[in-house]
C-alpha cells in the first residue's frame, strides 16, 4: 500500500463516538429595565383622582351627618308635639273638674250669703215682734209700691181682679191709686183679716197673697227651713 498515513496502534476506544467539545454556556445578561418616573401630567391626573375621591367620600359623610341632624330635629319636634298633645288630653279632665269645683264653690257661697241674709232678717223681725208684741208692719209707701208692682203684672190676671187691703190702708190706697185701679178694671175692697201694709189680689186664675203675715212666714221659712 502506498498510503502515506502514519501507522497507529488500534485500541477499543477507536470505536466510541467522538466526544463533543465542551463549550461553556454563557447566559444572556438580564436586561434591567428601570421604571421610568411618571410624568407631570400623570401626577396631576393622579392628584385629581385622589381629590375627587376624597371630595366624594367627604360629601357622603356630610350628607349622612346632615340627614342624621335633620332626622333628629324632626323627631324631636314630633316628640314635643305628641308630648304636648298627651299632656293636654290628660289635663282636660282635671281642668274640667276644677271648673266644676269652682262653680260649686261659688254656688255654695251664693247660697250661704242668701241664708245669712235670711237668718238676719228673721232675727230682726223676731226681735221686733218680741219688743212690740206683734208682727211689725210696714208703712203705706211700701204697700203702694207693692200694688204698683202687681199692676205691672196685669196680664197674669183676667176678668176684674179684686184688690183687698186692711181698712186702715183703704183710704190712702184709694187716694193714691184709685184712678189707676179703675182704669185697669180693678176693684178695691177693705179686708180686716189682713194686717196693715199687706194686700191680696183675687182673680179668676186664683189669689195672689202679698199680705204681711204671708211674707213673714216666707221669710221665716227661708231663714229656718223646716222650722216654720
Swiss-Prot record:
Gene Ontology cellular-component annotations: bacterial-type flagellum; bacterial-type flagellum secretion apparatus; cytosol; type III protein secretion system complex
Q: Name one Pfam family in it.
A: FliH
Where does it reside?
A: Cytoplasm
Q: Name one GO molecular function term.
A: cytoskeletal motor activity
> Which domain of life does this protein belong to?
Bacteria
Q: Which GO terms describe its biological process?
A: bacterial-type flagellum organization; bacterial-type flagellum-dependent cell motility; chemotaxis; protein secretion by the type III secretion system
The keyword Protein transport is assigned to this record: yes
Q: Which UniProt keywords apply?
A: Bacterial flagellum biogenesis, Bacterial flagellum protein export, Cytoplasm, Protein transport, Transport
Provide the family line.
Answer: Belongs to the FliH family.
| Functional summary from the UniProt entry | Needed for flagellar regrowth and assembly.
The protein's name is Flagellar assembly protein FliH
Amino acid at each position: 500500500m502506498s498510503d502515506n498515513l502514519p501507522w497507529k496502534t488500534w485500541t477499543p476506544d477507536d470505536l466510541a463516538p467522538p466526544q463533543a467539545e465542551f463549550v461553556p454556556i454563557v447566559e444572556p445578561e438580564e436586561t434591567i429595565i428601570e421604571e421610568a418616573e411618571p410624568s407631570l401630567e400623570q401626577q396631576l391626573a393622579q392628584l385629581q383622582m385622589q381629590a375627587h375621591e376624597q371630595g366624594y367620600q367627604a360629601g357622603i359623610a356630610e350628607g349622612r351627618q346632615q340627614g342624621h341632624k335633620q332626622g333628629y330635629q324632626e323627631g324631636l319636634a314630633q316628640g314635643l308635639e305628641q308630648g304636648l298633645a298627651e299632656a293636654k288630653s290628660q289635663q282636660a279632665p282635671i281642668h274640667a273638674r276644677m271648673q266644676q269645683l269652682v262653680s260649686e264653690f261659688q254656688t255654695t257661697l251664693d247660697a250661704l250669703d242668701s241664708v245669712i241674709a235670711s237668718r238676719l232678717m228673721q232675727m230682726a223681725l223676731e226681735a221686733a215682734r218680741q219688743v212690740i208684741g206683734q208682727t211689725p208692719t210696714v208703712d203705706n209707701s211700701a204697700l203702694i209700691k207693692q200694688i204698683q208692682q202687681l199692676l205691672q203684672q196685669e196680664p197674669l190676671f183676667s176678668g176684674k181682679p179684686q184688690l183687698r187691703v186692711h181698712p186702715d190702708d183703704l183710704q190712702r190706697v184709694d187716694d193714691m191709686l184709685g184712678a189707676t185701679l179703675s182704669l185697669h178694671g180693678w176693684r178695691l175692697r177693705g179686708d180686716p183679716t189682713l194686717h196693715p201694709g199687706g194686700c191680696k189680689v183675687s182673680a179668676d186664675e186664683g189669689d195672689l197673697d202679698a199680705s204681711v203675715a204671708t211674707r213673714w212666714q216666707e221669710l221665716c221659712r227661708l231663714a229656718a227651713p223646716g222650722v216654720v
